Amino acid sequence: MADNDNEDVIMDDLVEEYVETEEENFVDSEEESEDKDEIVESPSICEGFVQASSQTLVIIPDNERITSNVLTTFEATRLVAVRAQQLAINGSTMLKKKYSSPIDIAKQELFNRKIPLLVMRCIKVTPDGQKIVEIWNPREMGIPLLD
């Protein structure tokens, strides 16, 4: 699983651009989806997403973000679903207390701010193919209540 320290290295003070072609790397269809908000597992997965697409990815620096610092219900639910799927295939938990199901563990990791995933929000796709995104760590975001 992703180490907590690895997630903090994703952003620089400068905007970073990555350009690769589809043939160079392949990632799962979950990261290739065209949703506005995407869940990425680590900085390397984020780079893999860009390498698998034909677009240039521009990451907005932390201090210039324009979207809300609150997770939407969709984002929170997707984080829980992706994390529960990881746990169901023998992923290690970030919690000390025992829970009965992967969904319960994933929810508690989210609410305890220990979930090892990141949220990538697409801000804009320019006509020349640049995809402008913000990458958020759920630990620094407000979390909605999930039933």
From Swiss-Prot:
GO CC term, one of those recorded: virion component
InterPro entries with a match to the protein in the record: DNA-dir_RNA_polK_14-18kDa_CS, Pol_omega/Rpo6/RPB6, RPB6/omega-like_sf, Rpo6/Rpb6
Subcellular location: Host cytoplasm; Virion
GO molecular function annotation: DNA binding; DNA-directed RNA polymerase activity
Gene3D superfamilies membership: 3.90.940.10
Pfam families attached to this UniProt entry: RNA_pol_Rpb6 (PF01192)
Keywords of the record: DNA-directed RNA polymerase, Host cytoplasm, Transcription, Viral transcription, Virion
Domain of life of the organism encoding this protein: Viruses
GO biological process, one term: transcription by RNA polymerase II
Family from the record: Belongs to the archaeal RpoK/eukaryotic RPB6 RNA polymerase subunit family.
Function in brief: Component of the DNA-directed RNA polymerase (RNAP) that catalyzes the transcription in the cytoplasm of viral DNA into RNA using the four ribonucleoside triphosphates as substrates.
Subunit structure: Part of the viral DNA-directed RNA polymerase that consists of 8 polII-like subunits (RPB1, RPB2, RPB3, RPB5, RPB6, RPB7, RPB9, RPB10), a capping enzyme and a termination factor.
Protein name per UniProt: DNA-directed RNA polymerase subunit 6 homolog
Organism: African swine fever virus (isolate Warthog/Namibia/Wart80/1980)
